[in-house]
């Protein structure tokens, strides 16, 4: 698959993720749209394959971070927020053991 196709896929994926993460928040949706478009336009004339790969890695990391770490909060009352988690954020509660296992 060509590099231009991969860049376009990343661009579309970032916009889809933006729409899911900031659903019903017009201000955040618009700010994210502007930032995504701005960053892609800024690097539009980049020709170095190494630099393009580096930029794509950053874009992929941003998409993953948005999808797995950002939670939406809605103001319900004065000093009160209602958190709206998405399915991507919900993980199983796995027991954690901070003691290392002994090798035998």
UniProtKB/Swiss-Prot annotation:
GO terms for biological process: cellular respiration; mitochondrial respiratory chain complex III assembly. One of its GO terms (cellular component) is mitochondrial matrix. It is found in: Mitochondrion matrix. One of its GO terms (molecular function) is protein folding chaperone. Pfam families: Complex1_LYR. The modification Phosphoserine is found at residue 60. Keywords: Chaperone, Mitochondrion, Phosphoprotein. It comes from the Eukaryota. InterPro entries: Complex1_LYR_dom (IPR008011), Complex1_LYR_LYRM7 (IPR045298), MZM1/LYRM7 (IPR050435). Assembly factor required for Rieske Fe-S protein UQCRFS1 incorporation into the cytochrome b-c1 (CIII) complex. Functions as a chaperone, binding to this subunit within the mitochondrial matrix and stabilizing it prior to its translocation and insertion into the late CIII dimeric intermediate within the mitochondrial inner membrane. Interacts with UQCRFS1. Belongs to the complex I LYR family. This is Complex III assembly factor LYRM7. It comes from Pongo abelii.
